[in-house]
Amino acid sequence: MFARERSDGYLRNALLDHCFVELLNDTISGEERWLKKLINSSLDIRTRLINNNTRMVVDVTNKSSIPYHIHITQCDNLKPEQKEVTLSPMSQTTLFLNGDDIKSPQYTLRASIKNAFNTEKKPLEYAFRLRGMDYMVGTESQNMYNIIPAPRSLEEKQGKFIFNKETRIILKDKNAEAPLRFLTDRLTRIAQLPLKIQNSTKSISGNYVVFSRANDPTLGNEGYKINISPEQIQVLADKEAGFFYAIQSLLQLLPPEIYSNTTAYTNEWSIPAANITDIPQFEYRGLHLDVGRHLYPVSFIKKYIDLMSMQKMNRFHWHLTEDQGWRIEIKKHPKLTEIGSMRKETIINRYSAAIPGIYDGTPYGGFYTQEEIKEIVAYAKERYITIIPEVDLPGHMLAALATYPELGCTGGPYEVGTRWGIYDDVLCAGNENIYPFIEDVLLEVFKLFPGEYVHIGGDECPKTRWKSCPKCQSKIKELKLKDEHELQSYVIRRVEKFLNKNGKKLIGWDEILEGGIAPNAALMSWRGVAGGITAAKSGHPVIMTPNTYVYLDHYQASMDIYPLANGRICALEWTYGYNPIPKELTEQEAKHIKGVQANVWTEYIKTPEQVEYMAYPRANAVAEIGWSSPEHKNWEDYLDRLQYQFK
């Protein structure tokens, strides 16, 4: 009953994700809909055609720790080569189906899951959806409109535009010049089509792609139009970002091999005919990455940015400092990376009062040099992504305190955090010496990151030390503050003044509301939506990032199936269905909701591969939340488009 109330997000989310499935040895029992949800989340199915479209290869990956014993009954007009199949845990199995000429866009493979029993104690009957010709490269049925995020308007047309060696690029607007290389580079490297660029359509014998000024105020900075026919592609925008996003849509309409890292060979490089008009819903479409708990190479940060740009996300929130590691080089304070970037070991289990922590005994550390950061910032800028750096304060500062213990309430000694969670030791709010330190750090941050916002955290700052600290209590009396919450607000406001003085704006987590929000601050609402509602009603810019919906370090499905992760369950369907505009806001108040962001905290995410595994496809869904208005979203259609993008 309570699950029907959206306010109780965790409970409803859990109920949505097969919590009523019982597992005993290898036997699964439960209500049929929960069993099907379990299987849907466990299996990844990809198809391809071979032998002149007479044989379908079906690669099935079982991502769960549960085996599935399958009896195949039929598959439309195709003949399965196997009748009995076991999908072992965490492994891939290949099925083969034969037919005279596999032309249909979709097939249904019907099977009985022999170790999954419904409430009537009968084996579960399950239908696997297999993709046919619509998902094969170089065929007459290639014309699929698999753009994510979904465009504002897409009118399907007959025919297709085929790139060939005679195709020409017509550049009529200089705003398209920089974005254009993201198309021509892939066509040259991957498709072996080094297309010529010219300024007019004179002396053109074949088809062409023309980039022109739209002169349409409704498109804003990021909107675009694309008109595709067999003879030409017309790309219209008024700003560089608009042309860039148009090119991202064109790339998604091409065969998926266009995203290969090496030369790809297909029958043709075609794009289905259509008229597209596209404008984003929100100006802020963000993805976060915590590098404080675990560090990732520069090459992966660039890949992360590439994936964001492909999906028209435009803000990368880079969480650079934590209790467990300081990851940004500060030249005035080199000890921050000499000492603060290294922890002596790392906890490897989920500990509690009843379960002691288990540690790996291995030192861990590293940081990004300022030259590396400049390189990444420039890389993001080329892809129309602004990086928002986070230096978390006054809490989550244990790595800094281990370096400079005099900045804490007790004076130390401190050590860089080795376990996850919240530490009582934070910056001493009554110590005036913390401000020169903060300002030194921020001045170097300002020079590295040209964006208007700097994130100062403000979250999870225990007041335990402040309550017993003479300096903090003296500061409360001196400023005539009510309590330690107002003391934190004093710290945030003082930092905000320094930011504003240097031409920057402050953004922080929703705890900065406690004790009174800084006057010009923007807020990220992570503890549900209440903080965002309060801030929007007060006229503050708000980014919605509630943990129930968009924390991608949370489990994607059953905690029994997936590797150790944070939080509870945050399923793809639940994420996709989220609307960042709270119903409690008036139309005018809703204008203060500037966008949405997904967060990836990395306590249990050690490698780049794990980051991708946890972030996607849910980050893909968040991209659509941020770009596409609710009336243009459709869950089933999204799944179809997503399946194609997995290729």
Question: Which residues are covered by each model-predicted region?
Answer:
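Acidic, contiguous N-terminal accessory segments
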Residues: K122-L124, M133-E283, N500, K505-W509, ...
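Flexible, acidic glycine-rich loops studded with aromatic residues
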Residues: K505-E511, G516-A521, R527-K647
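Carbohydrate-binding surfaces of carbohydrate-active enzymes
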Residues: R46-I72, E81-Q82, L95-N98, D134, ...
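Structural recognition of the beta-strand scaffold that forms the well-ordered cores
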Residues: F163, R285-H288, H317, P389, ...
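C-terminal functional module detector
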Residues: M1-Y135
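Flexible loop/turn segments at secondary-structure boundaries
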Residues: E177-A178, L295-P297, D323-E329, P394-A400, ...
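Feature activates predominantly on carbohydrate-active enzymes
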Residues: T218-D425, A429-Y435, D440-Y453, R494, ...
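Active-site neighborhood of glycoside hydrolase catalytic domains
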Residues: A400-E406, T410, Y414-A521, W526-G539
